[in-house]
Structures are given as C-alpha cells and as structure tokens.
C-alpha cells in the first residue's frame, strides 16, 4: 500500500485561522443536529397492535417485557447469519461500540439486540464476542418482517430504508431485497401498551458507531477511499471485521461488511 497523502504543513497562526473557520461550521452543524433531534422527538407514534413473541434466557417474552420495566426501548436489529453460524461483521462492530448500560438506564431507557435466529446460536456467538447486552430471538415471529429487518417477498412486501423493491433494484441495492438487514427501532411504553416511535437504517446507523466518530477526527478519517479519504487497505467501506479476526487473512462475502477469513 502506498503512503497516504498527508495534510499540508502550515504555521501555528495559519493552522489557528483554519481551525477557527472550521469551528464555526462545527457549531452550526451542532445547532442543526439539535434542531433535528428535537424534530425526531416530536414525531408521532404508532400503537403496536401485534402480539410479538421473543425468546430470551428467561423464556418467552412479549415486546413490553423487553423494556425491563423502563419506559423507553431501543432495539438494534442485529443481522445474524444462520448459514455461517455467526453475526454480521458490521453489526458486530456496532455492538462493540456500545458502552455501559447504566447511563441509558439512568434515562429510563433499555437497549437490546433482536435477531431472527435460534436463541442458542445467538448466545454462543455472544459468549465468543464477550458481550453482555440483552439479546433476544424473534425467530418464528413477524417482528423482523414488520420492521423491515428481514426482507423476503414470499412473506411480506419488500421495503428497506423506506424504499420498496423496485426502487432498491433501480438504485442497485439488491442486497437489501432478500435476507437479514441492519436497523434500529425505538419504542415507548405506557403501562402494557407499546408504541413505535422511530426506525432508522443504512447510514442512519452511523450515529451508533463511536469508533467512526473518533476516526472522523483524524487526517485519514475512516480510511475508506471516498470523500477525499485514503483507502487504507483497499477494501473501501468494507473493512470492519469481527474483533477476533483482524489478524486473519480476509476474503469477500456478501454481508454489509464484506471481508471474511
């Protein structure tokens, strides 16, 4: 790999002038983000009518049970590949970025993973990764299909990231037409009644990736070869791996992160 291009060298005075110019833009973006967050909070909510069932260490649960007594629930739709017997590299990177749950719990919020796979398989992979986040199986439930975390036109009309099958195919996003998909959904509970408030997919999930935000502070960025970044390993956006496999040779597969030993 050739040496990435470094930023030009400047005096401290020149650097400070450029930094203050960037700071003004950063502050404007922060204000825009605050306004967007406020608008997100004001979205209407939809009553959840279906009686979804999940499997967890405690046995069978319904959607309200996943709140663990709190008012707000965030579900990360984790792609688990039953054919490979392991989780998606990209989704695994998301979970690796999740910190201690106490801070969310202090805001009356529970965060869990949900996957359409056997619970025993999820638990085995969870042990391998060393995660403690609650993880539930939606296998046998319509939950994944209703919230577009699994696409299969034999079960339900295809939709991902608010695009139907025709639009996905027109945009060349054929990998979203069939199979497991990543996403995040937010629910609010009032007693036993649950409401759906928000779902996001695709690059909307980058807000969950603290490692990406750290890398965005650096001259090489994410090293993915777009928007002026160098491509540090020739894999573009598909460089993430399971955290215990970075030292192994990589091969291409069809997951959202496409390297695999």
PLM regions and their residue ranges:
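Non-globular targeting/processing and membrane-anchoring segments
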Residues: 1-73, 78-107, 124-130, 134, ...
């Amino acid at each position: 790999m050739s040496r990435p291009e470094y930023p030009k060298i400047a005096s401290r005075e020149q650097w400070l002038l450029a930094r203050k110019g960037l700071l003004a833009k950063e502050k404007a973006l922060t204000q825009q983000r605050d306004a967007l967050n406020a608008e997100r909070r004001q979205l209407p909510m939809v009553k959840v009518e279906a009686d979804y069932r999940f499997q967890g260490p405690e046995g069978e649960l319904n959607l309200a049970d996943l709140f663990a007594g709190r008012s707000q629930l965030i579900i990360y739709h984790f792609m688990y590949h039953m054919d490979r017997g392991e989780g998606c590299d990209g989704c695994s990177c998301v979970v690796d970025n999740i910190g201690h749950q106490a801070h969310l719990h202090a805001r009356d919020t529970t965060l869990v993973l949900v996957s359409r796979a056997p619970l025993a398989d999820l638990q085995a992979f969870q042990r391998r990764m060393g995660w403690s986040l609650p993880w539930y199986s939606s296998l046998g439930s319509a939950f994944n299909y209703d919230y577009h975390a699994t696409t299969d036109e034999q079960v339900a009309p295809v939709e991902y990231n608010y695009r139907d099958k025709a639009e996905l195919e027109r945009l060349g996003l054929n990998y979203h037409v069939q199979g497991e998909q990543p996403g995040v959904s937010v629910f609010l509970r009032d007693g036993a009644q649950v409401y759906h408030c928000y779902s996001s997919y695709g690059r909307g999930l980058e807000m969950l990736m603290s490692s990406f935000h750290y890398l965005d502070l650096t001259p090489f960025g994410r090293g993915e070869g777009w928007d002026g970044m160098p491509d540090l390993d020739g894999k573009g956006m598909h460089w993430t791996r399971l955290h215990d496999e970075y030292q192994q040779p990589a091969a291409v597969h069809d997951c959202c992160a496409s390297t695999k030993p």
